[in-house]
From Swiss-Prot:
UniProt keyword Secreted, yes or no: yes
Keyword set, alphabetical order: Antibiotic, Antimicrobial, Cytolysis, Membrane, Secreted, Signal, Target cell membrane, Target membrane
Gene Ontology BP term (one): cytolysis in another organism
Family: Belongs to the non-disulfide-bridged peptide (NDBP) superfamily. Medium-length antimicrobial peptide (group 3) family.
Expression tissues: Expressed by the venom gland.
Coiled coil: none
Gene Ontology cellular-component annotations: extracellular region; membrane; other organism cell membrane
Signal sequence interval, chain numbering: 1-23
Subcellular location: Secreted; Target cell membrane
Entry's free-text remark on domains: Amphipathic and cationic peptide with an alpha-helical structure.
Further comment found in the protein's record: Fragments comprising residues 10-25, 1-19, 7-25, 1-22, 4-25 and 1-23 have been detected in venom but it is unclear whether they have a physiological role or are simply due to degradation.
Propeptide segments, given as residue ranges: 49-79
Naturally occurring in which organism (per UniProt): Isometrus maculatus (Lesser brown scorpion)
The protein's name in its UniProt record: Peptide Im-5
Length: 79
């Protein structure tokens, strides 16, 4: 009888610990699932802005434009 009570107490203690940890991890997951898409979009926007800025700099730089034009003319000459 003594061991049975000890096992029952251990079972309930284990159940409470698992239940609390599940609730804690569930709340962390719900917070993370709300924040993660925002963080991903933030990095995508930064990358998109960098690409747009680079594209704008390429268009404004006459030397870069000449290099592209030379490359296209070489391709046409080879065809």
């Amino acid at each position: 009888m003594k061991y049975r009570k000890q096992l029952l107490v251990l079972f309930f203690a284990y159940f409470l610990v698992v239940n609390e940890s599940e609730a804690f991890l569930g709340s962390l997951f719900s917070i993370g699932s709300k924040l993660l898409p925002g963080v991903i979009k933030l990095f995508q926007r930064k990358k998109q802005r960098a690409l747009m800025k680079r594209d704008l700099q390429d268009r404004m730089d006459p030397y870069q434009r000449n290099l592209k034009l030379d490359r296209y003319l070489k391709q046409l000459a080879l065809d």
